[in-house]
Amino acid sequence: MLSKFSKYIMIGICLIFSGKSFSQSDQLLQDLGYLIDDALFFSDKYITPATDAAVYQSSSGWVYSAKKRKLWDVTVGVNTNFFFVPNSDREFQIKNSDFQLLSIESGATSATVPTAIGNGDQIYLAGDLDGEPIRIETPKGINQNVVIYPHLSGALSLWYGTEVLVKYSPRVNLKRSEYQVYGFGIKHNLSQYFKSLEANKINLAATATYSNEDVSFDFLDIQTDFGNLGINRLSGLVDTYQMQLNASKEYKKIEVLAGFIANVSDFKYKLTGTKGAIEETIPLQYILNQRLKEIYKTKANFMGEISGRYQISKIFIQSTIAFGKFVNSNLSVQYEF
């Protein structure tokens, strides 16, 4: 963590290189440093459960089938994803001792507030910025038990039992938030090397994928005598690298799959809303985005997956459930060319 002195130096340097004039007092620079620390603390607690959830939403439903397909077979799927929001990640507790500038307005020493995937409850935080009072309403969560979003997927069969996989979701507007995912991968059939497995209609496949998730939420709308502070939109950017093993058994027109998923995700955070009026004096959004690097993180996840796929001519209906820390379900309707 930066020392207090280093934080003020950072603000001062940004002022100089932004070409802005400033006559702000030392007290303002100190208070802004404290406010940045408070925003950083709250950002981490608020958005991390949502980015954890985004990994689950992007991780399941990659594999249509574990069996070896014919060269140049193409499958296109229209998917609806259902993420079940767990109670344990819907809220977190804050205490006055967590903050340097702000405090809970009601006079309480602690309070429970929603995460980005929590409910719509709000409280007020208050403080003084260079002697002028500020009042902040904590952000709401999406207030949904199940998050539903659509996405497209596809698979192209190449040589030697290898397939190229793609997944794409347009930017979906959820309640007080937006979500987008895209990714690609490679699947290779392993059971082709074991004739006894193929003879019994048992299939094995290994898959490697990459996906990028972008989740954005309404954040802190802070009005001050210096203008809006421009930290009203917070985004989580997640890069996920995944390995997956699947086994399946065919029963006439039904294929039942079971899989094991292991992935590693890099989490980054960024303020992406419209810059506030304070930017005419202090490049606050830039400073905060630099400080948000302090809460970047890398996490590993391990999850199971079960799936059932039913064929109706060239149309396939598939239901998938992935489970681990969270539970995520995907319903897919596919057409095979």
Indicate residue ranges for each PLM-predicted region.
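Bacterial Sec-dependent N-terminal signal peptides
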Residues: 1-28
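Outer-membrane beta-barrel biogenesis signature
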Residues: 23-124, 199
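Transmembrane beta-strands of outer-membrane beta-barrel pores
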Residues: 80-84, 168-172, 190, 208-214, ...
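Residues that define the transmembrane beta-barrel architecture of outer-membrane proteins
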Residues: 70-72, 145-150, 178-184, 200, ...
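Extracellular/periplasm-exposed beta-strand and loop segments of Gram-negative cell-envelope proteins
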Residues: 89-91, 128-144, 173-179, 212-240, ...
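Repeated loop/turn-to-beta-strand initiation elements of outer-membrane beta-barrel proteins
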Residues: 160-164, 193-196, 253-256, 312-319, ...
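Short loop/turn motifs that connect adjacent beta-strands in outer-membrane beta-barrel proteins
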Residues: 64-72, 87, 176, 191-204, ...
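Residues on the lipid-exposed face of transmembrane beta-strands in outer-membrane beta-barrel proteins
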Residues: 65-67, 76-78, 152-158, 184-190, ...
